[in-house]
Amino acid sequence: MEEFRIELRKPEEAASIEGIRCVQFCFKINHTMPMTEEYNRLVSELFMRNIGEGSRVMPPLTVVRGNRVKIGRNVVVMNNSLFMAAGGITIEDDVMVAANVQLISNNHDVYDHQILTCKPVRLKRNCWIGAGATILPGITGGENAVVAAGAGVTKDVEDNTVVGGNPAKVIKRI
C-alpha cells in the first residue's frame, strides 16, 4: 500500500473544511437518538453516503476525515469507535467492529511532527475486530480473520487467521 504524506504547516482549505465538517457531524450524531431516521441520515452524510445497506454504526463515535471512509453492507461498528481516516479506511461487507476499536490510517512522521504519514486501512469481508483493538496505518485485516480484544495490529492479518496480543501475533488458523 502506497504511503503518502500531508504537510500540516500548509493545510489545504478542503482538508480544514472536512475536519470541521466531521467534528460537527460527530457531535450531532453523538447527541441524536440512535437508530432513528435522523440518526441514520447523519451517519450516512458523515461518510458521504459511502455506507452500505444494513450497516449500523453505534454512538459515540469519533471520525476524522469521514470522506475517506467506505463501509460495505451489513457492517456493525459498536460504541466508542475512533476512525482516523486521512489515509483512507475501507470496511468490506459483513465486518464486525467491537466497542472501543481504533482504526488509524495516519501517523505523525517521527522526525517531523508537522507531517502526517498516511497508509490505508482495509478490513476484508467477514473480518471481526475485538473490543479495544488498535489497527495501525497500512494494515489489511484478512477475509474471515479475527483480531482478539485489546490487540495492537502492526502487520497485515492473513485470511482465516486469529491474531492477538500487542503486537498482535498469529494464535491459530481457522
Stretches with model-predicted labels:
Residues M1-G54, P167-K172:
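Terminal amphipathic alpha-helical/low-complexity segments used for targeting or macromolecular assembly
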